[in-house]
Every structure is written in structure tokens, then in C-alpha cells.
Amino acid sequence: MYCYTLLKFSASTARTNKKLLYFCITTVNYHIVNYSLMKNLYQKFLASTGVSTDTRNIAKGSIYFALKGASFNGNTFAAEALEKGAQYAVIDEAAYQTSDKMILVSDVLTTLQELATYHRNTLKTLVIGITGSNGKTTTKELIKSVLSQQLNVVATQGNLNNNIGVPLTLLSIKPETDIAIVEMGANHPGEIAFLCNIAQPDYGYITSIGKAHLEGFGSFEGVIQTKGELYDYLKAHQKTIIANADNPITEALLADYHNEYSFGVGKGVNIAVQCLGTQPVTIQFEDASTQTTEEGERVLIEGFTDAPTVATSHLVGSYNFTNIAAAVAFGKFFKLSNEAIKRGIEAYIPQNNRSQLMQWGSNTVLLDAYNANPSSMAAAIDNLLTMSDEKKKVLILGDMFELGNYAAEEHQRIVDKLKNYEWEGVYLVGSNFAKTQSPYPQYETFEAFKEVFPTLSFNNCLLLIKGSRGMALERLIQVK
């Protein structure tokens, strides 16, 4: 009955969405053919120590999934995985099936994703989905830090937020896990919807929507549509959305949807927040009061039900205020005490080249070199302008990747923005910045700038180092 109904629904939409028809039919066939295999594989998973995808760090007793990439074939390492202690190896090429410990499937990646969803559906764990153009990982880590004060929480490791990372996060959930926070990334339309079908989030939050991955999305409108796929899923399943009431773009995605829990600096929100400072970011938060009408409808009213609480973070920059506010909102939604939320915010220390403030000789370095796009680059420059004038300000900016046809325009826009202010020094690194009309020194490659960097004199300066991941500008502070 399930298969017939789904196929009937798919056929009715064929004229308007052939891709959906194909997806539905192939999904049904996959379940029909592989249900018994999946059930058997899941029992093996429960008896294992977990999942491995890399023979360089195989966990003893794990199940090895032989994934493929542009330059590698995991099937070729299946025997090695077993030798190193894997209990089983899941492969999709019969030529490599040399042991009864090797499980042959039609596609290893699809099997990994199906296993993750199967596991997710056997548990009572609540799943939070996080996406956005900027701040996903920082927000995810803040939410984890807050909720972990009173709940058992697992979250995406680092930024493993793609079609492999999301399943791995789900498979790390234990029966005792209360909440799983799943970060979802995308650089093409449809990816967030696909990840939602795997993770099946109960709650969700979009951090921000900016000019990231324009090459894959085609336009800013494409970014909005794709990031909005998280809210589309939540609305279709009547799930709760945590919303930033001060963000007009994400608010527009909600339209008339009422199952939301909001935060913001204005009235008519569940959690009222206020930014008391940005160096570091200090937040004040308090519950907005509600009353219930005779019809049973909850109505937000003015006034507050508890005294304001203030938390001082280890983050800098106004752009991190909403990341912290979102973590506060999740804490309040899940009934954590204000003190627990405060502890969680103040316990989080940024790492991995994300808004890291560090001393480097007589200089202060704001290392924000994990990634960059036009929106986050402009925000970082704006933040530097608000920081103390006691130190001379220097910017070392690297190329912003994946902008496609927008690359020249967006890099020039950043240069034009810089020209509006006085700086002690500006250094532009990368082939895109090298093509701009700029009054500042330009270097075609990181290697070219690395040769010059040791000769530069920085004394009592405030340095902003920011660029896309491929630039790896954090290497500079290991050079001088």
C-alpha cells in the first residue's frame, strides 16, 4: 500500500516535476530491494563500535564504508580495513569482495545515508537542523555548549555538514542522547532538502543568508531558496522553527507559519535580547511574557516574566551577537535555567580559525580565516572598524571562493569598501583580488605573499586575517 500510494502521488506530479517522480520511484525501489539487507546491516551496526570511512583511523570493531571520491576508491581499501580491525566492510564493487566480512551493496554512500535515517527513526532523540550562509558552525557549537549544561547532546563534528557528514552525525547518536544538532551545508539547489530527508529534523534554524557559493546557486535568490529548504521541510511536517525576528530575509521565508519560537531586540518575540557590547560580545536576555486567550491562543504581550540575565562571551563582532542569541533561544525553548544558559555561552571558546582573538607579539590578531564570502568579509571589516583605536589596524584579506561569474564584481566591491577608511596597511592575497583596481599591495598567490610577509613590520597592530578555506591564511602566523 505504501509503495502504491507513493507511486500514485509521484505520477500525478510528473508533468510539473520529473525529478521528483524519478526520486520517488527510485526511493521506493531501493527500499523494496534492500529492506532485508538494511535490517541485517543495522543489527551489525548495533553490535559494532561505530562507523569508519578512512583506513588511516579505523576504529577496532567498526563497520568500514568504502566511499568513493574524485581521486580515490574506498573499495580498494576494504581488505586493509578488515586487517586493521574493522568488523565488516561495506563495498559496492563485486571485484573487491574477497571475504564474507564484506557486504556488497548497490551504492555505498546511499547505504550509509539509509542506515543513518533508519537509526534516527529507531531513537527518541530530538534533532535540530542548522543551516545558513554564515555562522553555522559557531551557532551549532554555541547551542551545543548551552544545551549540554543540562542535556545529553551530540553535534556535527567540525563542519562535516554534507551528504556524508550528516549521516555520520546521525550514526553517532546513542540511545541516551537527548538532542542531536545537525549542521547542514550546501552549494547547490536541493542539497538542504536532501539532507532534511536524511536527518528529519524536529526543529530548525537558519543563521543568515548571504552571498555564499554563488557559483553553485546561480544567484542570491538561489541561495535564499536553497537555505529556505530547511524551513520548507519543517513547515511541511508542522515542526517548530526557531526564528530571528530581526532578520527580514529569513522572516519572509516563514510567511504565515505560526509554529515558531522567536528572539529579537524588538517586541512581539518569545525571547527579548539586547547587545551590550561587541568586544567581546555581551548579551542581555529575558523571557517575553505571554497570555492565553479564551480560544486557547497564545498572545505575546509587553513585559517580562523574569529578570534580565547578562552573559559575556569569548566572541567578538556584532555578527556573532545573533549566533549567541540563537543559542539563548534554544536554551529557553528547552526549558534550561537562565544560569545554565549563561554558563553555556561563557564556556564556549572559538577555535579552528573562527573569530579567534589572539596575541602575536605586541600585536592582536583577529584570525577569521576558516572561510569567507562577500557578506562575512564585509561584516568582518565593519567589526574591525568598531574595535579599539589604540592599535593600528591592518587587514590581510584572501580570495573569496565559489563566486563564479560574480567573483570580479564582489572582490572589487570589497576593495571599494576598504577605500572609504584609513588603514595602517591592507594586503590582498589571491588571483581574484590581484585583478581588482586597488591602491593596496596585491599578491597573485599565497606563496608570493608568504615570501614578503616576514619582511613586514607589525608593532602594536590589530590584524584582521580573513579569507576562504582554500587560502589557508592561518599559515601566516606560523611563518613570521
Describe each model-derived feature in a short phrase.
Residues 13, 20-114, 118, 316, ...:
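N-terminal leader/targeting and accessory segments in enzymes
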Residues 62, 81, 115, 130, ...:
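Residue-level signal for inorganic ion chemistry
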Residues 35, 41, 92-99, 205-364, ...:
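Acidic, Mg2+-coordinating active-site environments of NTP-dependent enzymes
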Residues 67-72, 350-353, 369-440, 468:
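Active-site beta-alpha connecting loops in nucleotide-dependent enzymes
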Residues 442, 461-478:
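Peripheral docking tails and interdomain loops at the edges
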Residues 130, 352-354, 470, 474-475:
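ATP-dependent carboxylate/acyl-activation modules
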Residues 26, 30, 111-245, 249-258, ...:
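Phosphate-binding loop of NTP-binding sites
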